């Protein structure tokens, strides 16, 4: 089976969030048994092409977007995946000077790329074309209007339903879409507005989200009734599939960044397992200037953004100070107000023996925190899937979560973690923290059972890939 994914980020090349990681994991698992290709834009300032001798092909092609255009497709293989990067030769201003993936004119940029990608797919042929989020939503309409050879199915995965790609009809008219297909993207209430996600929903053969609970949640999203109508119309061709994590990349067995490696098998003698985590904790605390006197260690490894529940993060700081345990927060702030608030907290708690706030992100430090911490707190307002809780469980770090989206699907309260539900109830959140800390301190048998359940949780990529293959073959 030949599968082509189209997206605007892919973790080995460039990423801004979970989409890039999820696509990488899925493509890697599929590539083990199927011809798998990922098509993304080339961002020259953000990624350097492999040397020419390492490329498997360089193709020139034409596409239509605001007139006849030309592009170059550079292809190479990465871990069995064919990666194709598009340089828009006659529209260089769209990507060549971009210093971030996302800019203010994303709809136009991504539609131009989608037009080039669709032209390439029509030329190359594929059995399955798999789109990721609204960014490449135009590809669905273009391939429905003019299918490629051997095309069996167009699949759309919604990594974050909150972003829809609102744009103008004028931008859709710049493509080769005819009036019928433009109407699939058009809003009835405002014919001059088109929504790339809306058209992709109608033009795709199957729609997936990244967790079963999130699939249910988006059917109850009435923030735009026309988008609600579109997703409701596809509900019988909608399925939630949990993302997986690459256990060859994430795991304490061979992670070179840890002070002490450890394995799930060590848990046959729990004291040896916890001694290994304690060695990692000691090394981390020395690095961060924290006191070893107070346990447990709770961490938050997250973007500090409204989606991630920053109001609960502040409550966690207070709770840690009041109950004498360690809290480590690491993540980049999104938004000036949040940055100011957390920068002030960082400064005021700089000498605290128990709380450390790091307004940055380091992959190495994150791994050391996963290994050292006893619990990881993820109080998201919404979470389509979430990988952090799965990574935490791989390291024997117990998740404390809000029961939403993929967090609800992966964490069972009192079994392999702790959870709360109300997105605005500080009392319920603090009760969850108290229950987790008390269990750690006073009920060692139950704590060991919870950690064991975390280590036994299956989050491998192959499980997710097999579920996608079922959809491809339907």
UniProtKB/Swiss-Prot annotation:
Name of the top EC class for this enzyme: transferase
SUPFAM superfamilies in the cross-refs: UDP-Glycosyltransferase/glycogen phosphorylase (SSF53756)
Pathway named in the protein's UniProt entry: Glycan biosynthesis; glycogen biosynthesis
Gene3D superfamilies: Glycogen Phosphorylase B (3.40.50.2000)
E.C. designation(s): 2.4.1.21
Keyword set includes Transferase: yes
Keywords: Glycogen biosynthesis, Glycosyltransferase, Transferase
GO terms classed as biological process: glycogen biosynthetic process
A molecular-function term among this protein's GO annotations: alpha-1,4-glucan glucosyltransferase (UDP-glucose donor) activity
Reaction equations catalysed: [(1->4)-alpha-D-glucosyl](n) + ADP-alpha-D-glucose = [(1->4)-alpha-D-glucosyl](n+1) + ADP + H(+)
Coiled coil: none
Spans through the membrane: none
Positions of disulphide bridges: none
Positions of ADP-alpha-D-glucose binding: 15
Family, similarity comment: Belongs to the glycosyltransferase 1 family. Bacterial/plant glycogen synthase subfamily.
Job description of the protein: Synthesizes alpha-1,4-glucan chains using ADP-glucose.
Entry-linked NCBIfam families: glgA, PRK00654.2-3
Protein's name in the database: Glycogen synthase
